[in-house]
Regions:
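N-terminal ligand-binding/catalytic initiation module
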Residues: 1-155, 374, 379-380, 384-388
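Adenosine-phosphate binding glycine-rich loop
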Residues: 158, 181, 281-389
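Short, ordered loop/turn segments at secondary-structure junctions
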Residues: 69-71, 79, 108-109, 134-137, ...
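Glycine-rich phosphate/diphosphate-binding loop of Rossmann-like nucleotide-binding domains
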Residues: 74, 79-96, 151, 157, ...
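Generic structural signal for well-ordered, non-membrane alpha-helical segments
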Residues: 25, 29, 36, 40, ...
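Solvent-exposed alpha-helices and their adjacent loops that cap or buttress functional pockets
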Residues: 12, 55-60, 96-97, 122-124, ...
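Rossmann-like adenosine-cofactor binding region
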Residues: 232-301, 306-308
Length: 389
């Protein structure tokens, strides 16, 4: 199928992938008076006296904003907020289909960090959570941080954290196959953007042995001429102060995680890794190294971002269930404990009998995923003290 042309036809036909359906009837005077004036005043006064009642008396409890500025949309780059709307609508469809979450796209016509933060913060009382989407680094880090400071609802940049959760789930199961512990592993990252940093932080929270982050210039190391964002990376990575190229970093490494550029890993670089290496080459549409080349070079398990190869790192395994769980307990945050719980829940859905080098993650359409992730995330929220009900 020619997905581009067929998708364009679908978009012209549907004129939007979302619509609003009323839950209250207004077919007669009494129904109208209950759903709207004068009866609605009773609900307004309840919320006036206790703002938390907005979760009980409106749809806020199940509603998430999907926010973009259109600066990093898929592989299309900075195409603007309006052009990003089809992607945001699609994301909202996935929220509903896989998590039962009502999501509303908000495309903000500004690239200014404070403009975006103020806009979303002022609207936060209408939502139970905010999913940031397709916002370019490094502004995405600052926007997320400032919104967390300004609001009391979960703020989650899926390009960072959704990718990190699914990648961690994949590695958890891959490590079972190669019989290694994450704490004993050297993990090399190619790409220091939003996803790379988030994955590295999550691996660090899980106790990874050594983390080495590489950008276009090579290994990131403390003491160099670093931007503030790179300095933050250097502070928790490369504890042995290694220097050199990506090829240097990969020598003897146990795990490679790529969120960078197509074809930058050669078969020689893959062959230089430790025995039974794990490679997650997630550049799209062309990975850092093709799976067949990686395996021929000695990699034991290979994952990519593509659906036509085994072991796709697909965010849809994570974000619907993560928000479902967070909303169910009215969480004030989505913290590291909740992300790790989500990753472990995803990994657990592949049984030991099923687990093999070409099957380390459940399928995107596996109906168990959303509930398993939601239940694990909700429990982690309770255990970590961010659940409010």
């Amino acid at each position: 199928m020619d997905y581009l042309s067929e998708s364009l036809k679908l978009h012209y036909e549907l004129r939007g992938k979302l619509e609003i359906q009323p839950r209250a009837g207004v077919s007669n005077k009494d129904e109208l008076s209950l759903a709207y004036t004068p009866g609605v005043a009773a609900a307004c006064l309840e919320i006036k006296d206790d703002v938390s009642k907005s979760y009980d008396l409106t749809r806020r409890w199940n509603t998430v904003a999907v926010v973009t500025d259109g600066t990093a949309v898929l592989g299309l780059g900075d195409i603007g907020p309006e052009a990003g709307m089809p992607v945001m609508e699609g994301k909202c469809v996935l929220f509903k289909a896989f998590g039962g979450v009502d999501a509303i796209p908000l495309c903000v016509r500004s690239k200014d960090v404070d403009d975006i933060v103020n806009t979303v913060a002022l609207l936060a009382g209408s939502f139970g959570g905010v999913n940031l989407e397709d916002i370019a680094a490094p502004r995405c880090f600052e926007i997320e941080r400032k919104l967390k400071e300004r609001t009391d609802i979960p703020i989650f940049h899926d390009d960072q954290h959704g990718t990190a959760v699914v990648c961690l789930a994949a590695v958890v199961n891959a490590l079972k196959i190669v019989k290694k512990q994450l704490s004993d592993c050297t993990v090399v990252f190619s790409g220091s953007g939003a996803a790379g940093v988030a994955i590295a932080r999550l691996f660090d929270s899980m106790g990874a042995g050594e983390i080495i982050m590489c950008d276009r210039k090579g290994i990131i190391c403390e003491g160099g001429d670093l931007t503030p964002a790179k300095a933050e990376i250097a502070a928790f990575t490369n504890k042995n102060h290694r220097t050199g190229t990506l090829a240097d970093a990969m020598k003897g490494a146990d795990i490679f995680v790529g969120v960078s550029a197509p074809g930058i890993v050669t078969d020689e670089m893959a062959a230089s890794m430790a025995e039974n290496a794990i490679i997650m080459a997630m550049a799209n549409p062309v990975p850092e190294i093709m799976p067949d080349l990686a395996k021929a070079a000695g990699a034991a398990v290979v994952g990519t971002g593509r659906s036509d190869f085994p072991n796709q790192i697909n965010n849809v395994l994570a974000f619907p269930g993560i928000f479902r769980g967070a909303l169910d307990v009215r969480a004030s945050d989505i913290n590291e404990e909740m992300k790790i719980a989500a990753a472990k829940a995803i990994a657990s859905l592949v049984s030991d009998d099923e687990l093999n080098p070409d099957y380390i993650l459940p399928a995107a359409f596996d109906e168990r995923v959303g509930k398993a992730v939601a239940d694990a995330v909700a429990q982690a929220a309770r255990d970590s003290g961010v659940a409010r009900i």
